[in-house]
């Protein structure tokens, strides 16, 4: 589409190694540079507490991280700064008139250069669809939503964090910012 996309980074440390703390540190680096709009996507809503724990452990305030579901789909997010926590299930949700993806993109703005953390990034596996045991299967909705978010915010600083990454190379199709395929790759 003619956009220059910022390259992403994959954090593949094992379970319990502190990937959440490292993700929080990436956000804090930008926060201290005055860039105060970030998106933290994770497996489910209860992990908000883990994100807040990691953020506060390095000096942030719990109130800096707010879950997107505090606002109804389609409602404008009034807080101009902060970290929006979005479970994958919320990211893919929609109503006839609007989607959560559109809502978070409007909040971020077209000039967004914040960090997008895809915690448990393997949850976006299967985005490309393919052949399943029972025939052709469609791509996963949350994987598609994750790729659309990356494509819509080309200047975002994308961090994929997962202890498992992918069980099959096709399940890395969500990691579009790694430069694994496409023009200019080997």
Regions found by a protein language model. Give the residues of each.
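Walker A/P-loop
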Residues: 5-26, 162
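Hydrophobic positions in the central parallel beta-sheet of the AAA+
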Residues: 9-10, 84-86, 116, 159
């Amino acid at each position: 589409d003619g956009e220059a996309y910022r390259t992403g980074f994959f954090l593949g440390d094992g379970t319990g190694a502190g990937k959440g703390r490292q993700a929080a540190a990436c956000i804090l680096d930008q926060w201290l540079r005055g860039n105060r709009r970030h998106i933290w996507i994770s497996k489910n809503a209860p992990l908000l507490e883990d994100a807040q724990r990691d953020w506060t452990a390095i000096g942030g305030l719990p109130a800096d991280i707010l879950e997107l579901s505090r606002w109804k789909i389609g409602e404008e997010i009034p807080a101009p700064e902060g970290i929006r926590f979005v479970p994958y299930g919320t990211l893919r949700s929609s109503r006839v008139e609007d989607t959560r993806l559109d809502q978070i993109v409007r909040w971020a703005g077209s000039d967004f250069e914040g960090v997008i953390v895809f915690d448990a990034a393997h949850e976006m596996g299967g985005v490309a669809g393919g052949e399943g045991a029972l025939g052709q299967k469609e791509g996963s909705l949350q994987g598609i939503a994750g790729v659309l978010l990356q494509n819509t915010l080309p200047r975002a600083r994308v961090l994929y964090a997962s202890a498992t990454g992918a069980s099959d190379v096709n399940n890395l199709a969500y990691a579009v910012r790694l430069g694994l395929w496409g023009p200019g790759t080997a």
